[in-house]
């Protein structure tokens, strides 16, 4: 009896010890973009925890070798890790595989060797396994590649010897559309479901959602986000909208409920972004969360977050699939964060709101031909995770010498409430064009029901400009090129060719000193970085732009001016705009009182913010006695059972670990370049790692080409 008691006591002690001691599994993958198909950005890993995170050190670095010298390349990839191998993409969108323990390269694939333009943005890759066969899918420009995941060689039985064109099947003359895919597709059985990036001007192609056979590359189904005749939502557009309008695309990824066979797809705005007089109506399915049947592509439900968008309020990230406890019941739901700083929480099965959502009146437009939608949806809960308006009272006084000029500017532009329509007078859009929330996504902890979200609180300035008619009296090709430039290029590169303040779009007033004429022509044709290719522009119009940029005095016959000057938007859109301009001081700081970047914890069961802290720091301001301001940030968080949140994203180029319960910053490490990507975490042979792409290249910071992995000693 005594022996039995001793044995029982020993057994209880062992069980108790196992319960209290946190154990990391031998091998835990990060097999899908953002961690899993439900986009939770969550890992059941706890070897690295609040007790030991300060001991975290770099254990390997992998250099891709192709960062740009002009600090304009980026690396936004969230790498996947499967069975000890990490797969990702480089600044020039080369796919690679490395050993996840050592960082040693296994193979690399260069799409440029296969006639694919590879200088757009890539956020990752998609893995599919059928028996022993392992395949990797990724897009470079408009080409979707299928590779042998073990060798990096193209799979000849997929599409056209290993690739398919994402331009095919869009519309007649689809080869002229700018099409790319910046975010990985998602796998359901033998399907890979893909969205695309398209132009944001009136030349945009349609944003079809398509499912391809993962074995053959054949198109299995297509969902028209601009409905065709007879399809649901057709009446929310002009009758011929499906033939001539574009956008309403899904560029930011998607989430999948495999048990229900439902895929949840966030969509962007219709094109042109800031004037919709030629697309009057509610514009379904732009700015929607779409729930589709994964087998057939049929619509199950939708929820539109912005009606008739005029503010470039694309849904920037895939929804998190979550479970909400409400009124004593557990409800399978989703949460969708927006650039506006709002969070929509919907029933996953029906699309019905979990918390009330109210349609509120918004201001009317005074632009020619435009008709704004009368109301917009505002969630009552959760409360916004950013401020919702900016007035002159919100200007900080860190640099008193600018007070008069800032107040003068504030008195001349429209501001002070959400959904102020674009105008020739100018407006402040807040939160800005890059959120609020952005493409890095949010981390959801299924154990606590807490959502962790990083956000920007940056005001941007915006002004519409009436398009000038061409000067038919000129005999210089450069004069025609100037008008074409202002219509197609000035929104990003500036009305005076000055570029943007952060360096994302370079100045062109010195392009003669930096690039050869043929190099500029290649970029116009194919695009580079954030710039799309301009395939829709006639060759004569491209020559006119080049004549303008290179100060050429080529003369043309007056009768040719009108033909060359039939610009893409003229007669379609009567306005262009001054571009995407952050409202910054000359020193580069936002003009609004901090915080400028935040990390928040939102209790999704209550619909309440549990805590919010600044994300990032300007050390020079902190030394002046100014509290941490936070910084603009890109890339998202991940959360673990070790009670930690890991996030890079901030302009100061640190990766950080926060206590998920309190928001306390526990650890930070200065990266070789900005970690403007969502990190991944995984375990191999019982050792947990955290890895992040350090591509930099945003917010005026240097570009990089390194992946850095961290672990405990």
What does each model-identified segment do?
Residues 53-65, 95-115, 144-176, 208-244, ...:
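Extracytoplasmic/lumenal domain signature
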Residues 22, 37-44, 67-71, 96, ...:
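Short, solvent-exposed loop/turn elements at domain surfaces
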Residues 23-66, 81, 600-602:
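Mature N-terminal segment immediately following signal peptide/propeptide cleavage
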Residues 30-34, 72-92, 118-143, 177-201, ...:
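Repeat-blade elements of multi-bladed beta-propeller folds
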Residues 15-17:
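C-terminal motif of bacterial Sec signal peptides marking the signal peptidase cleavage site
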Residues 36, 393-407, 411, 417-422, ...:
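Periplasmic c-type cytochrome electron-transfer domains
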Residues 2-9:
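Sec-dependent signal peptide recognition
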């Amino acid at each position: 009896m005594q022996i039995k008691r001793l044995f029982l006591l020993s057994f209880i002690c062992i069980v108790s010890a196992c319960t209290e001691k946190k154990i990391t599994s031998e091998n835990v993958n990060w097999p899908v973009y953002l961690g899993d198909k439900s986009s939770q950005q969550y890992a059941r890993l706890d070897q690295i925890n609040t007790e030991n995170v300060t001991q975290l050190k770099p254990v390997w670095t992998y250099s891709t070798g192709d960062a740009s010298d002009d600090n304009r390349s980026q690396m936004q990839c969230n790498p996947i890790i499967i069975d000890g191998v990490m797969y990702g993409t480089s600044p020039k969108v080369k796919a690679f595989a490395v050993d996840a323990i050592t960082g040693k390269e296994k193979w690399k694939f260069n799409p440029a060797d296969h006639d694919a333009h590879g200088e757009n943005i890539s956020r990752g890759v998609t893995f599919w396994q059928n028996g022993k066969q392992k395949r990797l899918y990724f897009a470079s420009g408009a080409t979707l590649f299928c590779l042998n995941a073990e060798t990096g060689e193209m799979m000849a039985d997929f599409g056209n010897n290993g690739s398919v064109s994402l331009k095919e099947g869009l519309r007649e003359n689809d080869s002229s559309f700018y099409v790319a895919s910046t975010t990985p597709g998602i796998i359901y059985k033998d399907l890979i479901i893909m969205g695309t990036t398209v132009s944001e001007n009136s030349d945009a192609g349609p944003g079809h959602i398509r499912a391809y056979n993962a074995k053959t590359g054949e198109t299995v189904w297509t969902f028209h986000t601009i409905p065709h005749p007879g399809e649901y939502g057709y009446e929310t557009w002009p009758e011929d909208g499906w033939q001539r309008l574009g956008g309403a695309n899904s560029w930011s990824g998607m989430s999948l409920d495999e048990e229900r066979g439902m895929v949840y797809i966030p969509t962007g705005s219709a094109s042109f972004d800031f004037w919709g007089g030629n697309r009057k109506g509610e514009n379904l399915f732009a700015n929607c969360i779409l729930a589709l049947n994964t087998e057939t592509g049929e619509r199950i439900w939708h929820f539109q977050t912005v009606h008739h968008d005029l503010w470039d309020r694309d849904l920037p990230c895939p929804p998190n699939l979550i479970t909400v406890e409400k009124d004593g019941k557990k409800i399978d739901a989703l949460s969708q964060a927006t650039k506006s700083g709002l969070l929509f929480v919907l029933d996953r099965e029906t699309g019905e709101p979990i918390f009330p959502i109210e349609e509120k009146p918004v201001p009317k437009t005074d632009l020619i031909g435009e008709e704004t939608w009368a109301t917009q949806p505002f969630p009552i809960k959760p409360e916004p995770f950013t401020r919702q308006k900016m007035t002159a009272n919100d200007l900080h006084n860190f640099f008193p010498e600018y007070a008069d000029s800032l107040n003068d500017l504030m008195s001349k532009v429209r501001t002070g409430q959400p959904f102020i329509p674009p105008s020739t007078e100018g407006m402040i859009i807040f939160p800005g064009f890059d959120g609020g929330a952005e493409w890095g996504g949010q981390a959801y902890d299924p154990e606590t029901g807490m959502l962790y979200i990083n956000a920007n609180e940056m005001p941007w300035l915006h002004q519409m400009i009436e398009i000038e008619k061409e000067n038919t009296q000129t005999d210089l090709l450069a004069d025609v090129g100037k008008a074409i430039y202002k219509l197609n290029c000035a929104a990003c590169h500036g009305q005076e060719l000055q570029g943007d303040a952060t360096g994302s779009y370079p100045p062109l007033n010195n392009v003669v000193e930096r690039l050869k004429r043929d190099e500029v022509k290649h970029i116009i044709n194919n695009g580079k970085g954030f710039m799309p290719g301009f395939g829709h522009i006639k060759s004569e119009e491209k020559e006119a732009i080049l004549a303008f940029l290179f100060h050429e005095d080529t003369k043309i016959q007056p009768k040719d001016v009108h033909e060359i000057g039939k610009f893409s938007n003229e007669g379609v859109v009567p306005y262009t705009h001054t571009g995407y301009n952050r409202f910054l001081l000359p020193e580069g700081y936002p003009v609004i009182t901090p915080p400028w970047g935040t990390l928040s914890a939102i209790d999704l069961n209550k619909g309440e913010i549990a805590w919010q802290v600044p994300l990032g720091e300007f050390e020079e301001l902190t030394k002046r006695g100014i509290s941490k301001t936070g910084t603009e940030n890109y890339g998202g968080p991940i959360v673990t059972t070790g009670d930690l949140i890991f996030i890079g994203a901030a302009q100061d180029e640190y990766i950080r670990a926060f206590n998920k319960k309190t928001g306390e910053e526990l650890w930070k490490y200065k990266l070789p370049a900005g970690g403007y990507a969502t990190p991944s975490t995984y375990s191999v042979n019982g050792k947990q790692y955290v890895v992040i792409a350090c591509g930099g290249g945003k917010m005026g910071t240097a570009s990089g080409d390194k992946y850095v992995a961290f672990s405990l000693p």
